């Protein structure tokens, strides 16, 4: 059987009234109390009791010179072979450290702000990890896809050729796929990009030689030549 002695003290008064019937041993499990006694001493009102449980709560301690309710839950770990004495200083809730005992007990409320700041920092770090910046290859691929799509649309608007619109749309869709796969599968994405850029360079270069039109044939063919070299460089860098 473990014996536990709990002593409650107050910073403002040496007289405390202990209400053992308020939340005393408020637990759903059975706790056989063999003995309960009150002892008087200078500045303390010890409550001594014995129980078979190792964790015992104590609450509802009210000072004689205050109308505020001091609620304190005390949990102590006991050993079966000895007696432990715990001196309790109850925490008075006066809202942000004001009033009686505010300087001593109210300052602990700032810990929640630190936890909130830590949570916000963690959230910002997770957001920073999710929103990774685009690489130069992705930016060039995205601009290249936009240029090819606009070129196909311009060919359709000028000559009414649905073939130009379809070719421009499919080419832009493939380049968008390359854009999405570059961070995770750079070799595969660069290989698809080389094939697409080479095909566009040949087709648009041939059209430019016939029509001598700078846009879209001339601009797309030059951009395709640049992107072909860029994708080949990306493949070689990824393999090494």
From Swiss-Prot:
The chain crosses the membrane at residues 164-184, 186-206, 214-234. Residues 1-84 form a transit peptide. One of its GO terms (cellular component) is cytosol. The lineage of its organism: Eukaryota, Viridiplantae, Streptophyta, Embryophyta, Tracheophyta. Residues 114-125 have a biased composition (Acidic residues). PANTHER family: PROTEIN FATTY ACID EXPORT 2, CHLOROPLASTIC (PTHR12668:SF37), TRANSMEMBRANE PROTEIN 14, 15 (PTHR12668). It is found in: Plastid, Chloroplast membrane. InterPro entries: TMEM14, TMEM14_sf. Belongs to the TMEM14 family. This is Protein FATTY ACID EXPORT 2, chloroplastic. Residues 97-134 are annotated as: Disordered. May be involved in free fatty acids export from the plastids. Keywords: Chloroplast, Membrane, Plastid, Transit peptide, Transmembrane, Transmembrane helix.
